[in-house]
Amino acid sequence: MVDIYYSRDGANSFFVINEKREAVLIDPSFSEHRGLFDHINKLNVKIVAILITHGHWDHIASLEEICHLYPEAHVYISDDEAEFLTNVDLNLSKAANEEGYGVNILTYLPIHLLKVNDRDIIEEAGFKFKVILTPFHTKGSACFYLENEKALFSGDTLFFSTVGRSDLPTGTVKTMESSLKKLKELPVGLKVYPGHGACTNLDREKKYNTYLKNI
């Protein structure tokens, strides 16, 4: 099953949970007033792995504490994106804190950090996630495709009726089309779990999302 936590700053976190209540957490978002951790307690799950779609602060803000609570959990991020975890300029936490968010970002890399690349398969908690690199929002942005669950975790690559911006550090419009084409070629019937906003499905986006439709 897939469970969703909507953080108060607007970023989404997702839990893919097996029958043993083991969970793969996708994007440990900002946890204002302990909201994310209260949600984990309510779910009564053990976090065994963390998948990061990209390294902006609103998608990794709770990573340090999650790693303390679940020290054996594997952390997956694309090879090109790993430096974002501790770089306050790349992950935009410096700018966020100047606006008063109070974000605590990792000052060290997690012990069980695993760097992945395009088409790699991540096997955790009985699930198989295929890595789809989609660089343009950031240079190492990735989506995670869970074929058996017909689910796509798209981070800030694909949203309901639109796509992510490309004007932030390391972002580029040059690779947008090739990145989105990878998603457009995926099978029909996929539910899309984006990094912000409402969930959607790939069939709808192929039909109505201008960025996908025109590729």
Regions found by a protein language model. Name each.
Residues 25-28, 77, 126, 194:
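Small/polar loops that bind or transfer phosphate-bearing groups
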Residues 30-34, 38-121, 207-214:
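Active-site HxH/HxHxD metal-binding segment of metal-dependent hydrolases
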Residues 40-46, 122-127, 146-148, 186:
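Glycine-rich phosphate-binding loop signature in dinucleotide/nucleotide-binding domains
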Residues 23-27, 49-51, 131:
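Short catalytic-loop micro-motif centered on adjacent basic/acidic residues
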Residues 1-43, 143-155:
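Conserved beta-strand hairpin/beta-sheet module of binuclear metal-dependent hydrolase folds
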Residues 31, 92, 128-215:
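Metallo-beta-lactamase
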